[in-house]
A protein has these predicted regions:
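Structured adenosyl-cofactor binding patch, chiefly the S-adenosyl-L-methionine
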Residues: 77-124
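A short aromatic-anchored loop/beta-hairpin motif
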Residues: 2-5, 9-26
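A short acidic, often aromatic-flanked loop/helix-cap motif at beta-alpha or helix-coil junctions
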Residues: 1-4, 47, 92-95
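Internal, active-site/partner-interface "lid" segment
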Residues: 98, 110-150
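Conserved RecA-like P-loop NTPase ATPase core
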Residues: 16, 68, 155
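S-adenosyl-L-methionine/SAH cofactor-binding core of RNA-modifying enzymes
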Residues: 20-69, 75, 112
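SAM-dependent methyltransferases
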Residues: 139-201
Length: 201
């Protein structure tokens, strides 16, 4: 919704670059929504989204995602109408719409009935607190690279052990921070200790 002057943004008080989204058009928009629910602002100043936050948001009956633009939104609107500010990462986007799409997709896939195979969620990266290891499909050979023999063996225990090893290895190499608070089985702890003694990161 626009002001009577037909605009939704104006220059910042005190000077500075860019334009600021005005509070009045935004407040009128929010107040026109019959069931606004929990109000989220996509903002570089917000809490970084992770899987735990997505699970928490998925429990809300209604969400309204407010997407910032330009230099940002008048702070008075944020103070009056926003329940939570969130960010999808430490980088700059043209607006909050792309971040909102990320939130919508992440929440949608954990709603029962959305995914064809609900069991696939259980082994997702960040659901297990570990990154997934390499995955393969046909053909068996591509650019002189073969599918690991263990995956063709049919031995489920060996395949499970291989996947655990690869998952821990990849997490240790690429996202070691995820291992800080992860709960591992005795078996996984032993594998991780072995990896740490062998790998030069």
């Amino acid at each position: 919704m626009e002001t009577e002057y037909g605009s939704i943004d104006d220059s910042p008080y005190g000077g500075g670059e860019g334009m600021v989204m005005m509070p009045e058009p935004l407040s009128k928009t929010i107040e026109s929504i019959p069931n606004v629910g929990f109000r989220i602002l996509l903002s570089p100043q917000g809490k970084i989204i992770d899987n735990n936050l997505i699970k928490s948001l998925a429990k809300k009956s209604t969400l309204t995602l407010i997407c910032g633009r330009y230099e940002g939104i008048d702070e008075r609107f944020i103070d009056s109408y926003v329940d939570l500010e969130v960010s999808v990462g430490d980088y700059i986007l043209s607006g909050g719409e792309f971040g909102a799409l990320c939130i919508i997709d992440a929440i949608s896939r954990i709603i029962p009935g959305v995914l064809g195979n609900p069991d696939s969620i259980k082994n997702d990266s960040f659901e297990t607190k570990l990154l997934k290891g390499p995955i393969y499909t046909r053909p068996k050979k591509f650019h002189d690279k073969n599918v690991p023999e263990v995956l063709l063996s049919g031995n489920h225990k060996e395949i499970e052990d291989w996947r655990l090893y690869q998952s821990l290895k990849r997490t240790l190499q690429r996202r070691p921070d995820l291992l800080d608070d992860v709960k591992l089985s005795k078996k996984a702890k032993k594998v991780l200790e072995d990896l740490r003694s062998k790998l030069i990161l």
